[in-house]
């Protein structure tokens, strides 16, 4: 069984037991979370969400992605600006997908 749910402004297609990376959630490692904004479950499409559908997950890691470098350069002016960014993420493992 698969489901499509949304969190952090993005949509994720998941199956039970799958590990996914989502935008940072303010939760401790080991805590449980349930997503009720389920867009699709095994062929039934919601308008906009499937009623009584829940995706349950457990937080297994909090971290930051690989650093990306941003360089702004003005030619002929000897002006160079360097900046870096590391996007925070939360890694989840999907425990169950249920429709009541």
From Swiss-Prot:
GO molecular function annotations of the record: rRNA binding; structural constituent of ribosome
Domain of life: Bacteria
Spans through the membrane: none
Pfam families linked: Ribosomal_L21p
GO-annotated cellular components: cytoplasm; ribonucleoprotein complex; ribosome
SUPFAM superfamilies according to UniProt: L21p-like
InterPro entries found in the cross-reference section: bL21-like, bL21-like_sf, Ribosomal_bL21, Ribosomal_bL21_CS
Disulfide bridge map: none
Key words of the record: Ribonucleoprotein, Ribosomal protein, RNA-binding, rRNA-binding
GO BP: translation
Record function comment: This protein binds to 23S rRNA in the presence of protein L20.
Family statement drawn from the similarity comment of this UniProt entry: Belongs to the bacterial ribosomal protein bL21 family.
Subunit structure: Part of the 50S ribosomal subunit. Contacts protein L20.
Listed name of the protein: Large ribosomal subunit protein bL21
Organism: Ureaplasma parvum serovar 3 (strain ATCC 700970)
């Amino acid at each position: 069984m698969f489901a499509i749910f949304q969190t952090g402004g993005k949509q994720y297609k998941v199956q039970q037991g799958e590990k996914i990376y989502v935008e940072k959630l303010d939760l401790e490692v080991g805590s449980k979370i349930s997503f009720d904004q389920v867009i699709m479950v095994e062929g039934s499409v919601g308008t906009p969400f499937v009623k009584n559908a829940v995706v349950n997950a457990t937080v297994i890691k909090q971290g930051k992605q690989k650093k990306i470098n941003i360089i702004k350069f003005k030619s002929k002016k000897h002006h160079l600006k360097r900046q870096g960014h590391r996007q925070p993420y939360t890694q989840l493992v999907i425990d169950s997908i249920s429709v009541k």
